[in-house]
Amino acid sequence: YMKMKYFIIFLSFVISVPVVAQEKYSTKNGTIVFEASVPSFEEVKAKNENVSAILNVETGDFASLVLINGFRFKVALMEEHFNENYMESSKFPKAIVKGKLKDFSATKLSNGTSNYTLEGTITIHGVTKPFETSVSISKKGDSLSVESQFVLNPTDFNIEIPKIVSNK
């Protein structure tokens, strides 16, 4: 009952300024929500609130790491299938995004929201692919909020979805 022809991923991080190095913002409790739901079928949605991310505001370099088995589903059986059958999280425990924000400038980060393009790579299920997505960064006081939404195709990452499941 898990139709996963596409994952829709919502990335959301609130990154606070560390005391020592002002040029790097980081968090260990960012959030990723993914959805692979289809109308009229059971909701396939999960959330992970222990995502690590770092942004170097001098270079625009960005990196994020998520432990796959940290995704929480409403239905325990879905979580089990996700980890064991699809993502094989014991073999491929993490997903990583690394990249650079194009035309990023720390001086543009006044209170408010700025939009950038993140170019780099994404590694899921042991497969690394070129990756590009729109990112919005909002500054409020000493914190940055980094948000993005994108669609991934599981077959691009050698994630096999049985036909009986993907045809539902």
What is each PLM-predicted segment?
Residues A21-K168:
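Low-complexity, acidic/polar, glycine-enriched regions of mature
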Residues Y1-Y25:
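Bacterial Sec-dependent N-terminal signal peptides
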